[in-house]
Amino acid sequence: MLPWKKHKFELLAEAPPRQASKPKGYAVSLHYSALSSLARACPEGALSRVGSMFRSKRKKLHITSEDPTYTVLYLGNATTIQARGDGCTDLAVGKIWSKSEAGRQGTKMKLTVSAQGIRMVHAEERALRRPGHLYLLHRVTYCVADARLPKVFAWVYRHELKHKAVMLRCHAVLVSKPEKAQAMALLLYQTSANALAEFKRLKRRDDARHQQQELVGAHTIPLVPLRKLLLHGPCCYKPPVERSRSAPKLGSITEDLLGEQLEQELQEEEEEEQPEGCPEEEENRAAEGDPAEEEAEAQRALVVAMHFECGDLLDTLENGRGEALGGGGGSLGPGAGPPPLLLGSASDMKAELSQLISDLGELSFGNDVRTLQADLRVTRLLSGDSTGSESSIEGGGPDATSATAGDSSRQADGASADEPHSG
């Protein structure tokens, strides 16, 4: 064997594997020292304290329940001239009841009461594709569980038409038992009161924030954080104006600089051509008259126009003003003189009219709140329908047809004067 190949095939023994040493990190020693010092400092209850350090903290979260839903039979609606007050729905409900043939004709629907308002969708599966109806909460002026027809729940809604026109309509639904109608009325009243209080609170907070921004600076006071808006959600009591159908559509305004320049030049030329003390100008000034009288005439015309638009809302005001004056005022008509409403100052008349219109936003309740809250049969139905509770809706049921014949005949006489629009 050659000398340089002598150790070529020597085999070396494999070294034994090293045992993994226990980690002696800083964190382990720190935890051990902290636990030992805690146990020495607090010998009583040390184990429970140590366990609470490593125990996960449990949090209780309130999950919002679904909005209460009821199965109803929608009977229809009828126009009314009273937005609130005891008995304001008697005539309209009588018309609806006679039109629906004592509750035998109607549309079966699912009615949901929420912070947005009253939502109704068709209950039949074949009619699910048909659009539902949403009655916004801030436009509902009155609700009641009718005492003459115990199974009928009615509400007055302020419909907004084109050109800011307003129409009051009474809607009525038939339910399976009187307690359900009372529960629906109580639930709508409570929901409206809570939503209105929340709307006022948010409005006051926004107003205070805007005032601080005006005083201190816009960049100093931040707006409401996005997380709070996502957590609580916007207030549904009164939606923004852009969602209203009567709101005007705003578009872009294009400026015509050339046209403005030409108009300004023509105006300057006319001023230069017409000298001071021109007799034509004096005649125009004499024809213009006193500006104070013009302003008074404009205010009278404005109040008369508002009176024609909101005539049904001003009946009580006119009657009270007529009694105070001894019945000396004339009737309001095309050829008549100014109404009794115009005898006061323009500011007082505007204030009274605005107060009447602003009061429409608050829901008026036609039943006794304390009596309904104390009735357990009513309060247990506030969460919605129970199983089999809609079994006797169709056909009116025995309680629904037990209305007095005198009321039905009396209301049927007035039904021909004003035909209701069924929904």
Curated annotation (Swiss-Prot):
Which residue intervals are annotated with compositional bias (Polar residues) in the record? 401-411
Q: Compositionally biased, Acidic residues: which spans?
A: 263-283
PANTHER family, from UniProt?
Answer: PHOSPHOTYROSINE INTERACTION DOMAIN-CONTAINING FAMILY MEMBER (PTHR11232), PROTEIN FAM43A (PTHR11232:SF36)
Q: Which portions of the chain have biased composition (kind: Low complexity)?
A: 383-393
Fetch the Gene3D superfamilies from UniProt: Pleckstrin-homology domain (PH domain)/Phosphotyrosine-binding domain (PTB) (2.30.29.30)
Name the gene.
FAM43A
Native organism is Homo sapiens
| Positions of region (Disordered) | 263-298, 321-344, 382-423
- Residue ranges with Gly residues bias: 323-335
Phylogenetic placement of the source organism: Eukaryota, Metazoa, Chordata, Craniata, Vertebrata
Q: Which InterPro entries match?
A: Adapter_Engulfment-Domain (IPR051133), FAM43A/B_PTB (IPR033930), PH-like_dom_sf (IPR011993), PTB/PI_dom (IPR006020)
Give TM segment ranges: none
Q: Name the Pfam families on file.
A: PID_2 (PF14719)
Family, per entry = Belongs to the FAM43 family.
- The molecule here is called Protein FAM43A
